[in-house]
Amino acid sequence: MNSRQVLKRLLGRDELLVAPGCFDGLSARLVEEAGFDAAYLSGGAVARSMGIPDIGLVTMSETIERAAQVVATVKLPIIADADTGYGNAVNLVRTVREFERIGVAAIHIEDQITPKRCGHLDGKEVISLGEMEKKLEAALAARTDSDFCIIARTDARGVHGFDDAIARARSFAKLGVDAIFVEAPQSEQELAEIPRRIPD
């Protein structure tokens, strides 16, 4: 099995997948040596390692370069933070092809405006549900390997509230994305409610 098939199997289990964050080859190697099953290339961590804030300043090319270094260093499946896809649906086609080309197992795409902000900062804005659906449809159509996972992330919790975040996540799931990421739930109750309210 290749790393994409491994990740799909891990996501299909009925148990939690812990994928610690990394930002370069060394930090990814530490995740692997600690015995985890996958690693997450964090956009925020990449930005901080470059000495800049996570407010959309890191380019796709810089993220791709860092992701390629990580993929070359470890055998773990790598989930890469692709921010907003670096633009609209047209940009997202290239984003998917580039991340797929370098061998990451999955990317997640968020529904913030471009340029985006770290999901834990105030002042975030999200695009319309319709625009995000078009972006996700473009991403799904652009991949050439069906095992390359597309994860849809919503930052609507901190903008419009929990119910809107769930409504968006349910819409994303209906499009056929491989996983859903509801950013920044504000309680254990919300965390538990997310999988109950979003269909498999």
Give the positions of each predicted feature.
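Alpha/beta enzyme core
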Residues: 2-200
